Amino acid sequence: LPFISLATISALREFPSVNSSFDIEKGIHDIHSHVNLGIAVDLNQEGLLVGTIAEADSFNLKGLARKISETSRLLRDGKYGLEDVTGSTFTISNNGSFNSFITSPIINQPNVAILSTESVKKRPVVIQSQDGTDSIAIRHIGVLSLTWDHRVFDGSIALLFLNHIKDKLEN
């Protein structure tokens, strides 16, 4: 999850409308200057909480991994305060830990989008060789899905956002 989180933070910087909040009743749309990353944490099938890693964009990979682990443990142990579960600007849901293929999580309001990481599995893919012939090979494939509020940004931004994450993970 730390690698995906770091790639997501990079994409949120590139596409700031995805790192925003929207309150239709108040008529407020805020684009946030920092990434407060929400991490959906399963409470042993007894519920789910979104822990917030404040200013996640200030951490390197090792620091982010440590904060994700600490936040998850805090929530599972029930030793969290309101500040630990509020203020996220974007959420990641790690549904792949439950062996999912494609899910559509519900947006954690007032965020405007949520990323779902699915399980990585071996899948058949078509590979084109240098001479132009196709063959089938087995590769590890992971799926990312994004649910977003179309009132804030359109599908083209969502796809560019996902492609940015994909490029960061592949390179």
Label every model-predicted segment.
Residues 1-171:
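C-terminal catalytic/motor cores of large multi-domain enzyme assemblies
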